[in-house]
């Protein structure tokens, strides 16, 4: 595993011919209709009170991609990430957006089985985009991970309690990731932008 991480670092630092500006990291996160803030404030001497839902909840999966300038394309679905779901995301959302805005992008994914499915690889090969897989167990090398933390904080703030409200809230939560945030996430994960 150490050798795989070192090889990835060497390739991603430009030695292997990949400029950090070209990297687009793909990942997914699950959000629930029960998301609520973890901390609260109230006037001194009073207890902070808020309702926090328990019991029935619904999961929504958000698939997204992050480039050095921000979110490139995202989609939310009421399903776990499977090969058909990921294929649909690539085909309908991400690849058309990248063709329009970032034709030289290099897609980077973790090792989720849906990312390695033969139909997904066939689609990526046919698209003409280069793609790479992160070394196993390396979320620290994926800048979209801290991005998901910011998205979930925004969703907690909005407290969407229905699936429709959660889908609607995902858009503004994703746009909360600014270009400055994205650049910081890239730096945090060790990717430097060229001068």
Language model features with spans:
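Short functional hotspots at interaction and active-site rims
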Residues: 1-195
